[in-house]
């Protein structure tokens, strides 16, 4: 029997809470509770990083230097060690993680750290067909000051598969939610787009969803077979700044982007 998909929510001073997928998706009548906006101005800072299960030194230093000022931190391969949970609950109002698979002590998966509570939370998992392990994704939504709702997708795509059937299957339920969402969207993470088939499928998905890709002038993203693995796509906002941090704290370099939520044109 397949294990139930859920997210674990971490909030300072409270026990961890298990969050199951909502009964109604965001676009078909999910009730949104009133919440404090994610930002109070027009700029939204986002950090995206495959943190390699915190296996290398200096990962905490990178988060402390670059993550604590971001409104959203989208981590992949985040292992819920006491150190990471402490950082998340100290600098952020809430952290939601979707366990993809359980390691000896702490589960690993995508984790979204946010400066405001999500009004919607939909955890997703897809099983790797060859290794029989899972990759996870998380769809969350946050109110913005302009009365719009921002949809955020944090994804770690399946890696080892023959062809792109499972790869496309993982994007399917995400696309169903994005295409019906009326407000701005961010989808980011480790897409494992290391083949021509995969990158073509990813770009086709982005076109169908009306998404634009964040471009980096000095592109130091982790590559496999000459193709980048990490991406940020967006809709309904403009890009003010975008950069890739070079570090040895993981086998991936973090992506930093600052959006202007009041414009749909890129400023850089």
Swiss-Prot record:
Major localization listed first in the record, in broad terms? cytoplasm
Q: Which InterPro entries match?
A: Endo/exonu/phosph_ase_sf, Endo/exonuclease/phosphatase, UPF0294
Compartments where located? Cytoplasm
Pfam families this protein is in? Exo_endo_phos
Tell whether Cytoplasm is among the UniProt keywords.
yes
Provide this UniProt record's keywords sorted from A to Z.
Cytoplasm
| Family membership noted in the UniProt record | Belongs to the UPF0294 family.
Full protein name? UPF0294 protein ETA_26410
What's any one GO cellular component for it?
cytoplasm
MF terms from GO for this chain are: catalytic activity
Q: Which organism is it from?
A: Erwinia tasmaniensis (strain DSM 17950 / CFBP 7177 / CIP 109463 / NCPPB 4357 / Et1/99)
Annotated TM spans = none
């Amino acid at each position: 029997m397949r294990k139930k998909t859920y997210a674990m929510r971490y909030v300072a001073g409270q026990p961890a809470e298990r969050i199951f997928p909502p009964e109604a998706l965001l676009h078909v009548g999910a009730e949104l509770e009133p919440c404090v906006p994610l930002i109070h101005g027009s700029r939204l800072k986002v950090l995206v990083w495959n943190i390699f299960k915190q296996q290398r030194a200096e990962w905490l230093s990178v988060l402390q230097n670059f993550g604590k000022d971001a409104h959203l931190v989208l981590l992949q391969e985040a292992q819920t060690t006491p150190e990471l949970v402490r950082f998340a609950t100290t600098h952020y109002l809430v952290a939601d993680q979707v366990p993809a698979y359980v390691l000896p002590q702490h589960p690993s998966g995508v984790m979204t750290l946010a400066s405001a509570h999500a009004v919607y939370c939909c955890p997703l998992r897809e099983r790797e067909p060859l290794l029989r392990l899972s990759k996870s994704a998380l769809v969350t939504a946050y109110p913005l000051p302009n009365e719009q709702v921002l949809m955020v997708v944090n994804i770690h795509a399946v890696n080892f598969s023959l062809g792109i059937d499972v790869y496309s299957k993982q994007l399917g339920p995400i696309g169903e939610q994005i295409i019906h969402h009326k407000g701005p969207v961010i989808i980011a993470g480790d897409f494992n787009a290391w083949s021509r088939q995969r990158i073509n499928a990813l770009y086709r998905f982005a076109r169908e969803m009306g998404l634009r890709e964040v471009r980096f002038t000095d592109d130091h993203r982790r590559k496999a077979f000459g193709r980048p693995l990490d991406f940020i796509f967006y809709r309904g906002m403009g890009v003010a700044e975008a950069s890739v941090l070079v570090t040895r704290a993981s086998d991936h370099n973090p992506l930093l982007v600052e959006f202007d939520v009041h414009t749909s044109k890129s400023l850089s």
